[in-house]
């Protein structure tokens, strides 16, 4: 067994974090920081601020919750862009095209754990004696013995599990070219897109200074579904989306989005949409052909708008039933597709 040459070398082989510095931290988080610095509408952050109209969380924990959700969201975008082989994110080249796959993956995964560490800061603000897992953890929890679990970590882990389950299903459908039903799609969206909305409202409820036992999770589940279906429509039928993310990028990704699912289901004997998804088109002609088919042959855009109008009506009704919320109504107005 060879001996170390000197004390410095010997020390460098002793496990520990004493050599870690801010320069290292900056270097490994750079792909995430790149995405995080891109200008966006921060819809989730605005939802959190609006929901606090009901829950009255103090400014310090409110800022932590906003930070956690933003970290998870932007880290997930880095991974999504890799899994979808995207080229643009908010009008800029995606992170993995600049930093490479390996650095981008590691950076995003690292930020997931940094976000979990941020949850430690919420413990002093957790409502004393508030141990109702029916309200906080909801029906999707896998926790069998709440008394033996840490509420904040349970919320965090459950919703990250849901997010990855939803994303996994979407990838399986895409790669196997298997069109889901609308019901399966809604369930997937509730897991994937709804996860961060639920995480936010559950953390807000856990830290609320308002003793109310109202369950706001169903409302935020509805928001998640509404938000994703609208995003699907905008991807195929909106000029602003084209400038920011690319023209009909969902078709290039082979994604079974809500309008596409309707188009396939409406004409089961017509394989045009399946064929387009299989080819993952990167140039306009095939995309324009599919969009024309969805708009004029199957009426899928009109159908999607009808569903969104119905969901919007439900959202407004739920908000009113919960006592009203001007901030949330402004966000519904912002996202509305009503002419």
From Swiss-Prot:
Binding site for Mg(2+) 3: 231
Residues that coordinate or bind Mg(2+) 1: 80, 84
Residue numbers marked as site, Important for determining product chain length: 112
Residue positions binding dimethylallyl diphosphate: 89, 192-193, 228, 235, 245, 255
Cofactor: Mg(2+)
Record-level Gene Ontology MF annotations: (2E,6E)-farnesyl diphosphate synthase activity; dimethylallyltranstransferase activity; geranylgeranyl diphosphate synthase activity; metal ion binding
Keywords for the protein's UniProt record, in alphabetical order: Isoprene biosynthesis, Magnesium, Metal-binding, Transferase
Substrates-to-products reaction catalysed: isopentenyl diphosphate + dimethylallyl diphosphate = (2E)-geranyl diphosphate + diphosphate; isopentenyl diphosphate + (2E)-geranyl diphosphate = (2E,6E)-farnesyl diphosphate + diphosphate; isopentenyl diphosphate + (2E,6E)-farnesyl diphosphate = (2E,6E,10E)-geranylgeranyl diphosphate + diphosphate
Pathway terms, separated by semicolons: Secondary metabolite biosynthesis
Textual note on the cofactor: Binds 3 Mg(2+) ions per subunit.
Entry binding sites for isopentenyl diphosphate: 41, 44, 73, 90
This enzyme's EC code(s): 2.5.1.-, 2.5.1.1, 2.5.1.29, 2.5.1.10
PROSITE patterns: POLYPRENYL_SYNTHASE_1, POLYPRENYL_SYNTHASE_2
Entry binding sites for Mg(2+) 2: 80, 84
Coiled coil: none
Gene3D superfamilies reported for this sequence: Farnesyl Diphosphate Synthase
Domain of life: Eukaryota
Stored SUPFAM superfamilies: Terpenoid synthases (SSF48576)
One BP annotation, GO: isoprenoid biosynthetic process
Chain's role: Geranylgeranyl pyrophosphate synthase; part of the gene cluster that mediates the biosynthesis of erinacines, cyathane-xylosides that show unique biological activities, including leishmanicidal activity, stimulating activity for nerve growth-factor synthesis, and agonistic activity toward the kappa opioid receptor. The geranylgeranyl diphosphate (GGPP) synthase eriE catalyzes the first step in erinacines biosynthesis via conversion of farnesyl pyrophosphate and isopentyl pyrophosphate into geranylgeranyl pyrophosphate (GGPP).
Family listed: Belongs to the FPP/GGPP synthase family.
Protein name: Geranylgeranyl pyrophosphate synthase AN1592
Gene from which the chain derives: eriE
